[in-house]
């Protein structure tokens, strides 16, 4: 499931977290997993915060709903002003427009995926790095995909954006090491969410992905590979990366 020990582990119990894209799928599972581990406060954010009303109502005083579109600098600035106590930043929000690189009609999907999957997390890391430093270092979790490490042509532009986000994660890890911030790359295989509805089973339950990510935080791990698909592909990439690439190259855009 995981690789490589990072900075000292962070305890979830009693911590303050911010989760992007918290209204459904893995993001909602993150909120539930943080609650189960005793987080003191969870800023649950989404572009449409009304979709978080039920969570905030059930967990008054702990779950705080927050309007946040990570492609909008003004939203990020507002969140950084309002959430000065954050110790754990979970960059979960993302999109998959299921587009190829050449087969797509234009570059719109590729640009949108880079904006949300790369520039959004980068902007969040930049805004919250000083906040994490002021609160003892804390941790950043970047939800990526095993496809950050190898391209699946049917989702070609998604894979490119996730590869960029993996490189971002490594760079941010290096820059924030001196302030004691753990930066975790989470790279699952297919997860059973609306975003991956067209991907064939087996798919990992989103709750399992969130739990594995938080296990990584509490163990001080830099890379986490939730589920059998991710761990198997990671081993394949270590042994014969070209063979994995050739195998995935058969899955072309429709």
Give residue ranges: language-model regions:
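C-terminal helical subdomain
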Residues: 185, 193, 197-235
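Conserved glycine-rich cofactor-binding loop
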Residues: 23-24
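Residue(s) in the substrate-gating loop at a strand-loop-helix junction
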Residues: 145
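Rossmann-fold cofactor-recognition segment
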Residues: 58-74
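Conserved mid-core segment of classical short-chain dehydrogenase/reductases
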Residues: 96-111, 154-157
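Conserved glycine-rich Rossmann-like NAD(P)H-binding loop of the short-chain dehydrogenase/reductase
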Residues: 35-54
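Active-site helix of classical SDR
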Residues: 125, 161
């Amino acid at each position: 499931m995981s690789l490589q020990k990072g900075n000292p582990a962070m305890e979830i119990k009693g911590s303050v977290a911010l989760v992007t894209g918290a209204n459904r799928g893995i993001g909602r599972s993150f909120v539930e997993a943080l609650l189960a581990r005793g987080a003191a406060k969870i800023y649950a954010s989404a572009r449409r915060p009304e979709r978080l009303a039920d969570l905030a109502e059930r967990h008054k005083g702990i779950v705080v709903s927050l309007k946040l579109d990570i492609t909008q600098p003004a939203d990020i600035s507002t969140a950084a002003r309002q959430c000065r106590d954050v110790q754990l930043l979970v960059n979960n929000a993302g999109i998959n427009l299921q587009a190829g690189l050449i087969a797509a009609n234009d570059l719109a999907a590729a640009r949108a995926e880079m904006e949300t999957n790369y520039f959004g997390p980068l902007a969040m890391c930049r805004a919250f790095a000083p906040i994490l430093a002021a609160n003892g270092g804390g941790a950043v979790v970047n939800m990526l995909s095993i496809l950050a490490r190898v391209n699946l042509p049917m989702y070609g532009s998604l894979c490119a954006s996730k590869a960029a986000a993996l490189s971002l994660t490594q760079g941010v890890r290096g820059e924030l090491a001196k302030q004691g911030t753990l930066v975790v790359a989470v790279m699952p295989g297919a997860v059973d969410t609306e975003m991956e509805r067209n991907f064939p089973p087996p798919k990992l339950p989103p709750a399992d992905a969130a739990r594995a990510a938080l296990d990584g935080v509490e163990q001080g791990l830099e890379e986490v590979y939730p589920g059998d698909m991710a761990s198997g592909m990671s081993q394949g990439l270590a042994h014969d990366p070209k063979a994995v690439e050739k195998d995935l190259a058969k899955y072309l855009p429709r």
